[in-house]
Structure formats: C-alpha cells, structure tokens
C-alpha cells in the first residue's frame, strides 16, 4: 500500500512538473533576428533552411514555415529582405518563400543586383533598379499589415534624421507606416555608397500625404537588429490580448535566435596604433563603418548573453555567427558565383562548429534543441486554443 502510494505521488510530481514546463513554454515569446550584410545573407539563409527542415521533420509537416513558430521576426538590410520573404503571404496566405528558397534567390538575383554599377565616383556604386524591380515582382502590393507574423524592419529617414521601424503593432498609432513591403525592403537595403536612398509616400489617418526619405536600416540599428526585435516583442507582450498572461515580460520568457552574416577575423589584425597615428579623414572613412558595425554587433551579443546568463536562461538565447571570414567572403557585394559558393560552404561548415569555446555543443545541435522548443511551444498553444 505504501509502495503504491509512493508511486502515485511520484507520478503526480512528474505530471505536475511536465505541466508546469509546458505552461511556461506556452507563455514564451519567440523572436528571430537576422543581421544585415548584403550577399552574405546566404549564410543565415543556410541556417534558416536547416532550422525549417528540422521543424518540418519534428511536426511531420512539409508545409511548416518559420512564420508559424516565431512571434516576431526582425531584420535589417539583407536581413530585412529575408524577413519579408518568410513572412509575406502568397495567394494561399502562406509565406511566398520557404527557407530553402533563400539561397537560390541570392544565386539568381544577386549577380544582377550587384552588377548595375552607375560608374560614378561621386555617387552610389549601384543604381538599385534591378533590386527594386525584383522586390516589386516578388512582394507585389503586399503591405506591412498583411505579414503573417509580427515583423520589425528598420530604416533611417535622412530628412527627419530619425530611425523608422516598420512593425504591425505600430500601425494603430501610425497608419502611415503601413507601407508596401517592396518599398520597405529596398529602403532597409539602401546602404549609403551602395544604393541610392529611397523616396516613397503613404497616407496618414487623415488622408494626408506622408513622405519617407530612407536609407539602410544599419544606419539606425548598426546591422544587428536583435535588441530592436526584442523591444518589439516586449511591446507586443504588453499590448496584445493573446499575451495577456505575460504582460510583465522578462527575458526568462523570451526565446531569441539571432543570426549573423559573418565577420572578418583578420580585421582586428589589419591596423595598429602606430600605423593609424597619422591617418586623416579619408583613411578613417574607409574603415570606420566596418569598425563601428563590428563593435556594435559584439556589444549587442555581449549584452544579451550577459542578461540571459544572469537570469539563468542562457539556453533561451542563441547567436549564430561566423567570426572567421576571409578573402572575398568578407565583401557584402561580391555576387560572383565562386564567392556565393564559398558563402554556402561557410554556412554549412558553421553548423558543425561549436557554439563557443566554453560550449562544445555545435550550432547544428543547438538549432535542433531550439527547434524542439519551438515545436513543443506551438503544439501547446494549438492544444490550448482547441479547448
């Protein structure tokens, strides 16, 4: 009798723990963030294809898409383009692009996007016409409010000198932000010196004309939009009725996947204090943007890692980044077939690398673990909604 009672107590404890775990998982807000980096978007493209493939296997659903699993998907520059590709609906109200379509997109269109050089020394390197053309063909008239999940795509308005963040949750207060996804994607990719700034107009709630004069989102978020995406997730948790149980969101309730486009390991070794002591404006101008972006990306990752670790939730945050790019793979606009093949290899090899020196788990293993959390959470919410 005592033995039977003990077994029943043990079973109850296991069920209670499991129920609590799934309840906590069901209340989590999931965030995907994708860095900028031009043609180097092939690297996160490889990672996203692997992740979506794992989700399809786990849920036995070949039609499963990343937008089904993430509450917020944010990106800047090429990351903004990927965000639009996996969240913009087709005629069946499903993402018009699967993750496996990303790399072929770069191979098909990259050489044309980065080939229309204006030939002007005092102007942008590329005219941007092909980029705008392909965005209009792929995204059509689709606007922000139609995105299949919350998005966070950044740009910078050079007329108002302020960042512009395109999200669904901002539309009630700022309906002028309900722009075409094609305009948004060009704007977030319009890196100064590479592409011309983008002008377009929408309407306010009063019907007045609202003008945008936008450049690359990296000017606003410096290439890594992870913190921006988290802030949008926080706002959604506070305002969306679907998340009423987690109004006071903290990082313990966040599941964050941040994808980089690679950094140059040799860059830190390129210059010394002695070498740069007599540099003037021209020399610094050639390298300061790369320095600033690298430093900002590092600090964003450092801040997020520290916060999640302090909350004993380090498994809730995964930064996937290649820190050893060399040669042509460091260039954002080298869309030669040879270089794109190298970038594919970088992405595939990255999956086999350890997450860090202190964590022998490979990125592939970490992404499988992440996929399991995403899958379990989706199932929990689906079961809860059926009652």
UniProtKB/Swiss-Prot annotation:
Q: Which InterPro entries match?
A: Acyl_Trfase/lysoPLipase (IPR016035), PNPLA_dom (IPR002641)
Q: Which UniProt keywords apply?
A: Glycoprotein, Hydrolase, Lipid degradation, Lipid metabolism, Plant defense, Signal, Storage protein, Vacuole
Write out the GO cellular component annotations. Answer: vacuole
Q: Which PROSITE patterns match?
A: PNPLA
One Gene Ontology BP term is: lipid catabolic process
- For the motif DGA/G, give the residue ranges: 216-218
What does the sequence similarity comment in the record state about its family?
Belongs to the patatin family.
- PANTHER family on file: PATATIN GROUP D-2, XYLOSE ISOMERASE
Name of this protein: Patatin-05
Gene it is expressed from: pat1-k1
């Amino acid at each position: 009798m005592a033995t039977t009672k003990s077994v029943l107590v043990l079973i109850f404890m296991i069920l209670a723990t499991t129920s609590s775990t799934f309840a906590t998982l069901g209340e989590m807000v999931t965030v995907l963030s994708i860095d900028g980096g031009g043609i180097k978007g092939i690297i996160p493209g490889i990672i996203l294809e692997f992740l979506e493939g794992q989700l399809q296997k786990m849920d036995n659903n070949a039609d499963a898409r990343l937008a089904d699993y993430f509450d917020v998907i944010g990106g800047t520059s090429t990351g903004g383009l990927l965000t639009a590709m996996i969240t913009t609906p087709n005629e069946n109200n499903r993402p018009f692009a699967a993750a496996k379509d990303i790399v072929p997109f770069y191979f098909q269109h990259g050489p044309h996007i980065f080939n229309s050089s204006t030939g002007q020394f005092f102007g942008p390197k590329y005219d941007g016409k092909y980029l705008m053309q392909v965005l209009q063909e792929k995204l059509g008239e689709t606007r922000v409010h139609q995105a299949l999940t919350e998005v966070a795509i950044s740009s910078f308005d050079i007329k108002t000198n302020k960042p512009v963040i395109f999200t669904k949750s901002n539309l009630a207060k700022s309906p002028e932000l309900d722009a075409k996804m094609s305009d948004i994607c060009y704007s977030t990719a319009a890196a100064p010196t590479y592409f011309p700034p983008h002008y377009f107009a929408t309407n306010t709630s009063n019907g007045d004309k609202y003008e945008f004069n936008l450049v690359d989102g990296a000017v606003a978020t410096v290439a890594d939009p992870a913190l921006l995406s988290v802030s949008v997730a926080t706002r959604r948790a506070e305002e969306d009725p679907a998340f009423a149980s987690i109004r006071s969101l903290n990082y313990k309730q966040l599941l964050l996947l941040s994808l980089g486009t690679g950094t140059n390991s040799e860059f830190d070794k390129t210059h010394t204090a002695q070498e740069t002591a007599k540099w003037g404006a021209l020399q610094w101008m050639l390298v300061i943007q790369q320095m600033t972006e690298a430093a900002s990306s590092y600090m964003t990752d450092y801040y997020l890692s520290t916060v999640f670790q302090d909350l004993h939730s380090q498994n809730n945050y995964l930064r996937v980044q290649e820190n050893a790019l060399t040669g042509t793979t460091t260039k954002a606009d080298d869309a030669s077939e040879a270089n794109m093949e190298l970038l594919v290899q970088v992405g595939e090899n990255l999956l086999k690398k350890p997450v860090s020196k202190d964590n022998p788990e490979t990125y592939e293993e970490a992404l499988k673990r992440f996929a399991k959390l995403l899958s379990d959470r989706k199932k929990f919410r689906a079961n809860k909604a059926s009652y």
